[in-house]
């Protein structure tokens, strides 16, 4: 169309928006591409993946199936990784719907060697969701371990299985054993800190996060996690704000870190400022956790109708989000 950027240029712009975590704007660009050139396969894949991450399952499934249809008409080598990505995403959509037979059927279509481990990880997750956690762990442990990257992938997969099953103590111990072999591994330390928090061991969480920050002063996730944890407990709020502002220095504009900053402001009584920050973060990244916080701030400001709208949107994004469910239960609200 005359005067319109080429889809390839618009695709590059969409990827730049994704890199900047401007997801809603990226999605708009992808939708323009698929409307203007419906045979542009890559746009369907990225659009479907993004929609799936936002829990918009029906449009995500449609976009991913359209990608598969287009990709299978083109040379296999051009799309082998993309097809594997699409099959994994379609499997996860089926898994979220508890259609485990369909989830496994999508995984069976993956034949790209580089993605077979990811497929087995998904199979293990499906087993765990069916209450077969021991079987799932055995499947993960049976995977090859030919190099350090594969060993790490297996560890991460097993820890994730245990975390999703809320088996926090065995997951914590598994990471502890790995840290005994690699005591300077800050990624393992960070993951163990997050599990310590789930177990309610907040002093251990803080000790581990401070260890991470000392070893990696630019690790913004550690500043954010510690700051948010303090804010959530209403403790040392000026320090919490300082930690989160430090995280934003390393990751400016990150909507999840902005969410943490807003939560500190809210805890300090700065409700209007908290609402402003959260509105901006939610616009940039519609997410159930951010929706929970934005709704609560609006509720406290007497904007009950707007709060309920945001909470309803949050439930559509992720009905199982713990923060959102806890917020609604605590405030005794049925949006």
Predicted regions and their residues:
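Register position in tetratricopeptide repeats
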Residues: 19, 53-54, 89-92, 96, ...
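Canonical positions in the second alpha-helix
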Residues: 32-33, 66-67, 109-110, 142-143, ...
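TPR alpha-solenoid repeat register
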Residues: 9, 43, 77, 86, ...
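Residue-level recognition of tetratricopeptide repeat
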Residues: 6, 15, 40, 49, 74, 83, 92, 125, ...
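Structural marker of alpha-solenoid helical repeat scaffolds
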Residues: 2-4, 36, 70-74, 112-113, ...
